[in-house]
Design a protein with these regions (language model features):
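Active-site neighborhood of glycoside hydrolase catalytic domains
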Residues: 42-60, 81-166
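Conserved structural scaffold segments of CAZyme catalytic domains across common CAZy folds
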Residues: 1-65, 71-80, 97, 102
Length: 166
């Protein structure tokens, strides 16, 4: 957190208006093989939580943005251990790429989970910008591709329509 605040001060001194915290702020996300999908703040990394960091950044006169990759999950994550059935599969097995799986956005419960969790974080920490990452091609989607994209549009609408300034 100390390093992030030092970077934020440097960003402010350079005239930046927005400070965006990238990947690694949550769960057991210490490498690209673990924690993706577990969007609870890692208090060892951010003792004051996202709210505390965001407040400090705003006190410097900048807005605060945050990274998410809500469509993906690592097999080494609490979310996957709790809901392995939420991962997209190719016939019978999940399709692993870049150490991650895609969540099945054709399923209403998956979309609800993403919307509820991301919305709560945005609202609690006063996030003004979301960096929505996605580093997978859609080959694993197959026949579900159209319904997956409709599910993604539903998630985006439900998160951002009530928050037009994000």
């Amino acid at each position: 957190q100390r390093i992030l605040l030092s970077l934020a001060k440097s960003a402010k001194d350079l005239g930046c208006e927005l400070f965006v915290l990238d990947d690694g702020w949550f769960g057991n996300r210490n490498n690209d093989k673990a924690g993706l999908g577990d969007y609870t703040v890692n208090k060892k990394k951010l003792p004051a939580g996202l709210e505390g960091l965001a407040d400090r950044v705003r006190s410097m006169g900048m807005e605060f943005g945050l990274w998410f990759e809500p469509e993906s999950v690592n097999t080494d994550s609490d979310l996957y251990r709790l809901h392995p059935d939420w991962a997209l599969t190719d016939k019978h097995s999940p399709v692993l790429g870049r150490n991650q799986l895609l969540l099945d956005l054709t399923r209403p419960e998956v979309r609800d989970y993403i919307v509820e969790n991301i919305s709560a974080i945005i609202d609690r920490a006063g996030i003004s910008y979301v960096k929505w990452d996605m580093n997978r091609h859609s080959i694993a989607l197959g026949a579900k591709a159209h319904d997956y994209i409709l599910g993604l549009y539903d998630v985006l609408r439900r998160i951002f329509d009530p928050r037009p300034n994000v």
